[in-house]
């Protein structure tokens, strides 16, 4: 069976800045080295993993801000559903460094509770004041039902629907209608009713506006019952 990889990655800034600094200092682009360009690309994560794991299937990276990893799973689901791949390694990975975090802080999204980092992130709390930056990665391997049964795999979950939408109004301030459309689209694709959902994994950035609008969207879609968030 052909195995592909679709990963989410928002940015890769360190290599770009380090290369620019080296060129500025040495006045010679040849001294940057051939590896720098591959480290600068968002697709460096899927390129490297495909070589390490010797994957021969679909291979690309999705960059969709905080939704990058979720979109990777959604696209993997669609590819398998359409019969284009049997198995896809899906997930997301993001580096953390002072260079990218410094510019990110320009939108005042970070909590200022520096003396208590473990309790600074307070999603949907009235005293929330922003998120805590971090880096890392996570993987979900998707496989067609037929492929999983054939190899005797233990099936632990099923992806039944995928939804997406853009708010189309502001580059950084979320609205309510965008999340509502994406939730409703996922439910429609899965052919299930909102009342059947018993758990919702929220974006929950702990920002004042973000959490407020997300909560409004959740209540608008799941107005027939309270869903654990």
Model-derived features with residue positions:
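Stable alpha-helical structural segments in soluble proteins, enriched in small hydrophobic residues
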Residues: 1, 72, 182-190, 221
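Short acidic capping loops at alpha-helix termini that bridge into adjacent secondary structure
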Residues: 1-2, 86, 158, 193-198, ...
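Active-site-proximal alpha-helical scaffold in enzymes
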Residues: 42-45, 50-53, 58-93, 131-153
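Condensing-enzyme catalytic core mediating Claisen C-C bond formation in acyl metabolism
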Residues: 115-192, 198-199
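Solvent-exposed alpha-helices and their adjacent loops that cap or buttress functional pockets
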Residues: 29-30, 38, 42, 53-56, ...
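A glycine- and small-aliphatic-rich helix-loop capping segment at beta-alpha/alpha-beta transitions
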Residues: 12-30, 79-82, 102-114, 177-178, ...
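Acyl-CoA/ACP chain-elongation machinery
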Residues: 84-129, 162-176, 202-212, 226-229
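Conserved beta-ketoacyl condensing-enzyme motif
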Residues: 1-64, 93-101, 194-212
């Amino acid at each position: 069976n052909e195995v592909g990889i679709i990963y989410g990655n928002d940015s890769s800034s360190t290599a770009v800045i380090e290369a620019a600094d080296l060129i500025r200092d040495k006045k010679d682009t040849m001294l940057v080295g051939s590896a720098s360009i591959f480290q600068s690309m968002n697709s460096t994560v899927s390129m490297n993993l495909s070589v390490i794991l010797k994957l021969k299937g679909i291979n690309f990276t999705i960059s969709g801000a905080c939704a990058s990893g979720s979109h990777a799973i959604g696209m993997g689901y669609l590819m398998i559903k359409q019969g284009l791949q049997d198995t896809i390694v899906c997930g997301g990975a993001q580096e953390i460094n002072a260079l990218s975090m410094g510019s990110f802080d320009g939108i005042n999204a970070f909590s200022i509770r520096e003396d208590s980092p473990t309790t600074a992130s307070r999603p949907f709390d009235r005293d929330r004041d922003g998120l805590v930056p971090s880096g890392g990665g996570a993987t979900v391997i998707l496989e067609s039902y037929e492929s999983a049964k054939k190899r005797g795999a233990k099936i632990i979950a099923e992806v039944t629907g995928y939804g997406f939408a853009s708010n189309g109004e502001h580059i950084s301030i979320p609205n309510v209608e965008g999340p509502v459309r994406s939730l409703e689209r996922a439910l429609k694709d899965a052919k299930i009713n909102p009342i059947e959902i018993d758990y919702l994994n929220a974006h929950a950035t702990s920002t004042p506006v973000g959490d407020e609008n997300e909560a409004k969207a959740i209540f608008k879609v799941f107005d027939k019952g309270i869903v654990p968030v």
